[in-house]
């Protein structure tokens, strides 16, 4: 399997949980130190890991990254599109859309071009912000996440080969990126309104992603699964 944006947060949790389930994991990120520490963590646990610093806006880099992964793993059954801009507040609308939604489409297209088999699956990381008000998010963020949800449903409908395509839609998740971006008062307000009374953890989302990839979810297709502690029912 391949996880983009695997260096921290949801991507890192997904890679670890899926590795613990016995999957071979390829991890892409542009943060070399995070990639190195993740690789050490996973290999110490006995996992087979391929790590690469891949710019997911560069189609040639994407192709090279897949080639390097295939040399070790052969067929890549599962794809998790998680990468996005690291400094959300400083991103322009067009760049945010390209970085989040455009890169998801580019990586998925390159993955599909490698050839698919029955049972292959992709999970994209959307957001509840794409379904409900974006709150304090920059305009590009809910727009990009809504596009990712739509792209996921498109893939499920078209089903190139025999893939399944699903997405997760996290609410507020306690990741370094989110904590740095949101003001404390805003985060507290969201948490107070949540039926579960807390923010999500990366493992909450990672576990949902790994489930959607697994044979246990073999008849789940075209779903955008909220992983938000019930935040959507309060709107």
Q: What are the roles of these predicted feature ranges?
A:
Residues 32-33, 53-65, 203-204:
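The beta1-alpha1 cofactor-binding region of Rossmann-like NAD(H)/NADP(H)-dependent oxidoreductases
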Residues 7-9:
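Conserved glycine-rich cofactor-binding loop
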Residues 169-180:
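Short, flexible catalytic-loop segment of classical short-chain dehydrogenase/reductase
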Residues 160-164, 220-222:
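Short, small/polar-rich loop/turn modules that mediate ligand/substrate recognition or access, typified
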Residues 85-89, 121-160, 172-173:
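Catalytic loop of short-chain dehydrogenase/reductase
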Residues 132, 210, 221-235:
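Short C-terminal tail/terminal secondary-structure segment
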């Amino acid at each position: 399997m391949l996880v983009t944006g695997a260096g921290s947060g949801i991507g890192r949790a997904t890679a670890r949980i899926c590795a613990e389930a016995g999957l071979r994991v390829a991890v892409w990120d542009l943060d070399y130190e995070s990639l190195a520490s993740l690789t050490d963590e996973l290999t110490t646990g006995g996992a087979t890991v391929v790590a690469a610093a891949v710019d997911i806006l560069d189609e040639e880099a994407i192709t090279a990254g897949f080639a390097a992964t295939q040399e070790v793993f052969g067929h890549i059954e599962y794809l998790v599109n998680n990468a996005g801009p690291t400094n959300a507040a400083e991103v322009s609308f067009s760049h945010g859309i390209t970085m989040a939604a455009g890169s998801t489409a580019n990586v998925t297209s390159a993955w599909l071009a490698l050839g698919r088999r029955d049972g292959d699956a992709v999970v994209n990381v959307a957001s509840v912000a794409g379904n409900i008000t974006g709150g304090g998010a920059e305009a590009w963020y809910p727009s990009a996440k809504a596009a990712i949800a739509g792209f996921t449903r498109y893939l499920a409908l078209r089903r190139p080969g025999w893939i399944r395509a699903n997405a997760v839609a996290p609410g507020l998740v306690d990741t370094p990126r989110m904590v740095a971006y949101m003001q404390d008062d805003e985060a507290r307000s969201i948490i107070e309104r949540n039926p579960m009374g807390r923010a999500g953890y990366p493992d909450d989302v990672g576990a949902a992603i790994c489930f959607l990839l697994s044979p246990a979810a073999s008849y789940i297709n075209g779903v955008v699964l909220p992983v938000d502690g019930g935040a959507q029912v309060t709107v």
